[in-house]
């Protein structure tokens, strides 16, 4: 529940929150806008693309929306002061002279590489892919398929039911799916040959022809310039082990070692025997440090040294001569990687590859430079106890070694000679108190001797033999508790825990206060390539290119250099919600604070700076487990579930023609850094090598590549429990819990009238003790009291000065593991540290393994037409053609001597075929052949150019409401709210302490100070506070706030539109509700029909029916469109809204409803008798289709610009039958200003037997 103060704040914000940008002016009807005064109904344009109107003292402004009609000019211009582009006046261009193409020249020498272009502006983010199916929960209990429905109930993604008619007239449902294709008709008869048509546009490029024979070898080109230096090679393999060096010289004494790790806690010692009281001896001089022991056995071989730094890059090799061009090879491999693209969504984690084979054991390399500090590995297993070595001779002081990491604890060795005093170790936890020994007799107190003069330092004595092991001494008296240590260094972040089981859905928590705006994080690394975007709109068709002769395919060109980034494209439609990003790294653990007792609330002080990180304190004892808390309030609905996998890949594009051979490109930019390779298995341990001589410091090499991470070590023993880390980042929200059962609605009680003033009540109970008075003057000193009992033990004193370091004690035996403590209370979250500076760039990693193939890319845009190719080689001789027609008649020979008429001879043999005649004209088109069997699948050609854009399709039906978008950035903290009302008086406090110190204080007290004069106080208040009135007012205000925050669609509490009503009350059914889009006075609210399935707001026309009759009679029927409301007798334009309200009220509410909506739709049903509404069945065209008039007085037609085309859901008026039929029109648009329809204009009317009527459907906004 929301507190009263919060609700009052929301009430005040809601009252003063304007819902629409309006400038409310004085009540005289005039308006003032931007310092200019306007009269009522004045219209002006403050900007070229904005128009405003003064409406009864209110300024309504709207943007001018240009028609989406395509202009038939390449570069439209916007005139000065106008908003929409127009085609400029162009002058005819001079015609170009024809030209002939010369032979192809030799390739020129490569130019010098150009300067790197300036980076282009960042492109608009691509549209995310469609959401995929929900993921599968591996650890969830098995559930039936129906249990996912609660997760999607909040999105209202439901199957569309059969549309119910809107009373009182029915509305046709959505069109059914298209029927199956009919069988092909029989071939028609051959028609007469048509006349020659005009020259058609160039056809689509044909399939590429077969590869021609390779051309002759070209001339060898001149040698190119030497290439740039290559990138450094990968690090070489470790070299062979060198010869052992000579023993080094004696090094300087090393620095004192770091304090050793804290030893295991020893066992409790036995009670010692009672000692004899000895005389206190004089303090002996400090002995000289003993000689170092002999070096022990050589230890096992150390781990393989770190990888050495890579050597300097080699010089560039000589540039070889260009070889002769070979034959055209197959499609080459992908070119070098381009520059890194914009970051895309993270891909899914791939499966771990199989472990590689164990490599051969390499020789240990030379020791590399010390690397950066790595993360601490897991503790190794406990090694075997070492053997006790025999005491060796004193060795020379060795060189200072590099401090090693703490090794595993060895077995308990023999006690060594007492060493020199080391630095004080870390303070250990206090041991358990030992048993008290028997009290010894006190020795005689010696006299204090005089300080002697310090003697000269004697020479070091010879090393004594090792003495026998002494008995362990008795435990000392437990020391006083030490001061609290400073906080420890920040611990390393713990590894990610296993995912917990899915918890039950929590109840709704109360909203927390807004946190301060966090500092800007470090710049993240570039993401991987994004998922394929939505398919782009087809481009404008290019001008037809000239037909070039197909040339032979050229040799494969080398990849060219990356071009400069193109300009940013236009902003695309907003995409659906993308995949969620990967889980961020765990935050660094915060400081553990002690849980203090809750103090009284203080006034908020200014935020202090973050303090330095302190040293770690000793771990406290585990507290008892807390009681289980009460369940919290119901939680808010969870965030949207994870999107599914990527959608199916699109169809492959058509193959395109091969382009001409490109020039040789310069060297490409280096590709993005690859991922680290899979680490190999750990090789076997090599034999220990002898200690080499210490070499001089070598020159600093270039920074080497970061080596792959080593294999994980064997699991160590159980480590000490680490400090509690900072709370990690908030995990992903769990799935929303199941929807609770609907509660029974309680009856709303009417507000009671204020009761009559009651009689004055009886005297109330004694009030709580008043505030403490001012302190009195200091009294006289009293007599000394009797000595009190012994006090409890005092707290630890201040820390004394540091004592001399004691000798190192024997390491105690390891103690047993303690029982795990109970879970401590959760400490308060630490203060947020300041953002650290961005870390230095890490070394470049080695090349990663090739990634998996990316998803199928989208079809590319149509490339620019290529230049005409070179002339092809002559084709092979074709097969002989069919015999030609008879040749032309030969010329007449000279006249012969006339012979006698002979008898007709017998028919001769067929003569030899004549020569091939000229090619005849093309015959008429033959009948369509039968469908052939599908051919074999051809080889995949290169992608073809994109076809010209098709006509705009009809508007689709509105899709379901998409899922809620991602949570926006956190807003800035709002201003402080007004002070809340004073709270109710609290209950009476507990009785104060009585009488001081008990029975002993009943005696005579001390004399008090002399009193002051009279004190004047206020008269008692006559009128008591009436809590009933206050509670009644609070309840009334609370109800008003609830109504503002959650309107119910009633006349007294209207909503802005049906979509808001659906979000606030998803349980409501479709029906009539009250809305007030302009959020003004409730008296101008309008009643609408709410479709709760989609959230649409529907207004009915008034009247909604045009009667069926003969509305228009003329002799020239069917010649032009006639508007029903403008031209026909008795006709009217369609109006919408409540007829009882003034016309301007409905217009204003409709204007605001358009602003609050993103799309609109409306159906018009035309009833016909011998009148064609859309398709003329006789002619097969739509020349007699009627027109609709939009609210902005533009025609909505059957053909033309698709933005102004209606759809036809049912067409029953295609011919004159003498019977009534109907045609249903539908218009959907995202330009809400175009609806509703205000008039209709049929064309096939005017005859005495032609009648029509209209049903105007409701206009629906979403």
From Swiss-Prot:
Sorted alphabetically, which SMART domains does this protein's record hold? COLFI (SM00038), VWC (SM00214)
Gene3D superfamilies for this protein: 2.60.120.1000, Complement Module, domain 1 (2.10.70.10)
Keyword check for rRNA-binding:
no
Localized where? Answer: Secreted, Extracellular space, Extracellular matrix
For region Nonhelical region (N-terminal), the annotated ranges are 145-164
Q: Which InterPro entries match?
A: Collagen, Collagen_Structural_Proteins, Fib_collagen_C, VWF_dom
- In this protein, which residues make up the domain named VWFC? 29-88
* One protein family per Pfam: COLFI
- Annotated glycan sites: 1163
Q: Which family does it belong to?
A: Belongs to the fibrillar collagen family.
Name of the protein in its database record: Collagen alpha-1(III) chain
The organism of origin for this protein:
Gallus gallus
As recorded in Swiss-Prot or TrEMBL, the protein's gene is named COL3A1
């Amino acid at each position: 529940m929301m507190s009263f103060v919060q609700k009052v704040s929301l009430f005040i914000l809601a009252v003063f929150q304007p819902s629409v940008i309006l400038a409310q002016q004085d009540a005289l009807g005039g308006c003032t806008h931007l310092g200019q005064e306007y009269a009522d109904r004045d219209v002006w344009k403050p900007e070229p693309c904005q128009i405003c109107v003064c409406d009864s003292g209110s300024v309504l402004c709207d943007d001018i929306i240009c028609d989406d009609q395509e202009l038939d000019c390449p570069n439209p211009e916007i005139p000065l002061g106008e908003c929409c582009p127009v085609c400029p006046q162009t002058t005819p261009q001079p015609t170009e002279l024809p030209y002939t193409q010369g032979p192809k020249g030799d390739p020129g020498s490569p130019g010098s590489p150009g300067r790197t272009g300036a980076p282009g502006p960042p492109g608009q983010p691509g549209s995310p892919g469609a959401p995929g199916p929900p993921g599968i929960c591996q650890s969830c209990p098995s559930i039936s398929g129906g249990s996912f429905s609660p997760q999607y109930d909040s999105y209202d993604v439901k199957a569309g039911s059969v549309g119910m008619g809107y009373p009182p007239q029915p509305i046709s449902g959505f069109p059914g799916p298209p029927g199956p294709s009919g069988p092909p008709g029989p071939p028609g008869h051959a028609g007469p040959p048509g006349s020659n048509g005009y020259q058609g546009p160039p056809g689509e490029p044909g399939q590429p022809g077969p590869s021609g024979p390779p051309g002759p070898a070209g001339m060898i080109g001149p040698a190119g310039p030497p290439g740039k230096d290559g990138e450094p090679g990968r690090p070489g393999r470790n070299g062979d082990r060198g010869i052992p060096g000579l023993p080094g010289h004696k090094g300087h004494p090393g620095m004192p070692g770091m304090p050793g790790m804290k030893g295991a806690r020893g066992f409790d010692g036995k009670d010692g025997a009672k000692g004899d009281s000895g005389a206190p001896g004089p303090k002996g001089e400090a002995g000289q440090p003993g000689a170092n022991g002999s070096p022990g056995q050589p230890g096992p071989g150390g781990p393989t040294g770190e990888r050495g730094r890579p050597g300097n890059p080699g010089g560039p090799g000589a540039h070889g001569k260009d070889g002769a061009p070979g034959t055209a090879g197959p499609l080459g491999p992908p070119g070098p990687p381009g520059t890194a693209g914009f970051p895309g969504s993270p891909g899914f984690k791939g499966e771990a590859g199989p472990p590689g084979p164990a490599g051969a054991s390499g020789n240990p390399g030379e020791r590399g430079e010390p690397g950066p500090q790595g993360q601490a590995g897991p503790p190794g297993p406990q090694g075997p106890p070492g053997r006790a070595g025999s005491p060796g001779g004193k060795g020379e002081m060795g060189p200072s070694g590099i401090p090693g990491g703490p090794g595993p604890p060895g077995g308990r060795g023999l006690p060594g000679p007492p060493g020199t005093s080391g630095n004080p170790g870390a303070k250990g936890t206090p041991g358990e108190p030992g048993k008290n020994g028997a009290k010894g007799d006190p020795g005689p107190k010696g006299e204090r001797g005089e300080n002697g003069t310090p003697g000269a330092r004697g020479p070091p004595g010879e090393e004594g033999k090792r003495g026998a092991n002494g008995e362990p001494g008795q435990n000392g008296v437990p020391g006083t508790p030490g001061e609290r240590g400073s906080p420890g260094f920040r611990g390393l972040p713990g590894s990610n825990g296993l995912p917990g089981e899915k918890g039950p859905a929590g109840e709704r928590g109360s909203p927390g206060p807004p946190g301060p705006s966090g500092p800007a994080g470090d710049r993240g690394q570039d993401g991987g390539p994004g998922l394929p975007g939505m398919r782009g709109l087809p481009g404008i068709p290019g001008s037809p290119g000239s037909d070039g002769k197909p040339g032979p395919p050229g040799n494969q060109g080398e990849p060219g250099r990356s071009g400069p980034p193109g300009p940013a494209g236009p902003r695309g439609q907003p995409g659906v919600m993308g995949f969620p990003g990967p889980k961020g790294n765990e935050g660094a653990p915060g400081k553990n604070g002690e849980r203090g007792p809750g103090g009284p609330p203080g006034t908020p002080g200014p935020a202090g700076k973050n303090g330095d990180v302190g040293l770690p304190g000793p771990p406290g004892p585990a507290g008892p487990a807390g009681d289980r808390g009460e369940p919290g309030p119901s939680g808010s609905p969870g965030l949207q579930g994870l999107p599914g996998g990527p959608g199916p890949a699109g169809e492959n594009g058509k193959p395109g023609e091969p382009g001409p051979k490109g020039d040789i490109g310069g060297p490409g930019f280096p590709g993005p850094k690859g991922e680290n390779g899979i680490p190999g298995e750990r090789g076997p341990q090599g034999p220990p090598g002898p200690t080499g001589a210490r070499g001089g410091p070598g020159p600093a090499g270039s920074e080497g590549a970061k080596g792959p991470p080593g294999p994980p070590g064997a699991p160590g023993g159980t480590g000490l429990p680490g400090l509690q880390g900072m709370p990690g980042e908030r995990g992903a929200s769990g799935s929303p819990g199941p929807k609770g059962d609907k509660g029974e609605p309680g009856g709303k009680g009417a507000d009671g009238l204020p009761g009559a003033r009651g009689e004055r009540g009886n005297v109330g109970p004694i009030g709580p003790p008043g505030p403490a008075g001012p302190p009195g003057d200091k009294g006289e000193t009293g007599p000394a009291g009797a000595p009190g009992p012994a006090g409890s033990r005092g707290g630890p004193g201040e820390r004394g000065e540091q004592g001399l370091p004691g000798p190192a004690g024997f390491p105690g035996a390891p103690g047993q593991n303690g029982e795990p403590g109970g879970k401590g209370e959760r400490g308060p979250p630490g203060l947020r540290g300041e953002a650290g500076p961005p870390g230095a760039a890490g070394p470049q990693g080695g090349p990663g393994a090739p990634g998996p193939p990316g998803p199928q890319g989208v079809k590319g845009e149509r490339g620019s037409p290529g230049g005409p190719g070179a002339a092809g080689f002559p084709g092979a001789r074709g097969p002989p053609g069919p015999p030609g027609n008879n040749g032309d008649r030969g010329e007449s020979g000279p006249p012969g001597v006339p012979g006698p008429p002979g008898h007709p001879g017998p028919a001769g043999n067929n003569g030899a075929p004549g020569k091939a005649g000229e090619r005849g004209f093309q015959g008429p088109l033959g009948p369509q052949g039968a469908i052939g069997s599908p051919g074999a699948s051809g080889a995949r050609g290169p992608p073809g150019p994109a076809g010209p854009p098709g006509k705009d399709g009809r508007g689709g039906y509105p899709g379901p409401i998409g899922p809620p978008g991602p949570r926006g950035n956190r807003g800035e903290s709002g201003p402080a709210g007004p002070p809340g009302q004073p709270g109710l008086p609290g209950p009476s406090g507990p009785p104060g302490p009585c009488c001081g110190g008990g029975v002993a204080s009943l005696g005579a007290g001390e004399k008090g100070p002399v009193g002051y004069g009279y004190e004047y106080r206020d008269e008692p208040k006559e009128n008591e506070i009436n809590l009933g009135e206050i509670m009644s007012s609070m309840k009334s205000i609370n109800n008003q706030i609830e109504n503002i925050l959650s309107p119910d669609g009633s006349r007294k509490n209207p909503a802005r539109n049906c979509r808001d009503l659906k979000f606030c009350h998803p349980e409501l059914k479709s029906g009539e509700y009250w809305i007030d889009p302009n959020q003004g006075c409730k008296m101008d609210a309008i009643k609408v029909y709410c479709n709760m399935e989609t959230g649409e707001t529907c207004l009915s026309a008034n009247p909604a029916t045009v009667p069926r009759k003969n509305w228009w009679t003329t002799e020239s029927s069917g010649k032009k469109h006639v508007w029903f409301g403008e031209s026909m007798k008795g006709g009217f334009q369609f109006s919408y809204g409540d007829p009882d309200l003034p016309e301007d009220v409905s217009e204003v509410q409709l204007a605001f409803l358009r602003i609050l909506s993103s799309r609109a739709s409306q159906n018009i049903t035309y009833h016909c008798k011998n009148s064609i509404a859309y398709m003329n069945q006789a002619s097969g065209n739509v020349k007699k289709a009627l027109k609709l008039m939009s609210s902005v007085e533009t025609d909505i037609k059957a053909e033309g610009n698709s933005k102004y085309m209606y759809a036809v859901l049912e067409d029953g008026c295609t011919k004159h039958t003498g019977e009534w039929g109907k045609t249903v029109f539908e218009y959907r648009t995202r330009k809400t200003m175009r609806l509703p329809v205000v008039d209709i204009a049929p064309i096939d009317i005017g005859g005495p037997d032609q009648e029509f009527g209209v049903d105007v459907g409701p206009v629906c906004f979403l």
